[in-house]
Amino acid sequence: MNSFQALILGLVQGLTEYLPVSSSGHLVLLQKIFGLKENVLLFDILVHLGTLVPLLIIFRDEILAIIKKPWGRLPLLIIAGTVPTALIGLGFKDFFERLFVSGSTLGIEFIITGLILWLAERQKSGRKNLEKTTFLDAIFVGVAQGLAILPAISRSGLTISGALIRGLNREWAAKFSFLLSIPAILGAAVLDLKSFVEQNANLAGIDLMPFIVGFFAAMLSGYFAVKFMLEILRKGKLTWFSYYVWILGVTILVLQAAGKF
């Protein structure tokens, strides 16, 4: 992997982690296009950590409130949502990893993501804020986040859609989705790091510059993606993303049918 490839992958990771178009699906797609196979796991760890930084900056007030009052309503809702995510992720880890490697279901999953966004956009605007959100709501969104481990199913798309279906207002749905992603991203990074160590991998002879470039590219693009997504949710424009992932999904299916993917 060279620095240019790392820059593209980092920018795409940061944007697609928070825009509802599936970061994992785009990374699998680009890695196939670039023909990348070596040190992909370590790169994935770093770019995911890079996308975490914007959340820590943008939602610093909420995070500080959680630290000061760890048994308040918000942290308990996040815990309730994180448990099903962890159970699904750990329970089906090997299955999900096989799908990542093959990329055989990317087209179908992009189309499913578009359908979910399209249906969510047609939900009536909810009125639930933090105080009115129940633990059942949080668990529902957490299950959605767990299912989004599939390669081209958008995590932000599925969790925001799940929150809207449960009646959360748009601004709170986006905020809860982003806050719920923090333990998920951290947990995934820890598991990937464990796998990296178990593979007896080391950094000897590895050019670290592409990894540094990827980290900062993901961090910067992720920041703008979160800000943009919060604005989009206020305006109710999720269907824009539906059309994009539908076109992408159909294109992949056509290429697969032609034996060119």
Swiss-Prot record:
The keyword Transit peptide appears for this protein: no
Entry EC number(s): 3.6.1.27
First-listed, main subcellular location of the protein, grouped into a coarse class: membrane
Coiled coil: none
Gene Ontology cellular component list: plasma membrane
GO molecular function, one term: undecaprenyl-diphosphatase activity
Root EC class: hydrolase
Claim: Transmembrane is one of the keywords in the record: yes
Example GO biological process: response to antibiotic
Function field: Catalyzes the dephosphorylation of undecaprenyl diphosphate (UPP). Confers resistance to bacitracin.
Homology family: Belongs to the UppP family.
PANTHER family in the record: UNDECAPRENYL-DIPHOSPHATASE
Remarks, miscellaneous: Bacitracin is thought to be involved in the inhibition of peptidoglycan synthesis by sequestering undecaprenyl diphosphate, thereby reducing the pool of lipid carrier available.
Descriptive protein name: Undecaprenyl-diphosphatase
Organism encoding this protein: Carboxydothermus hydrogenoformans (strain ATCC BAA-161 / DSM 6008 / Z-2901)
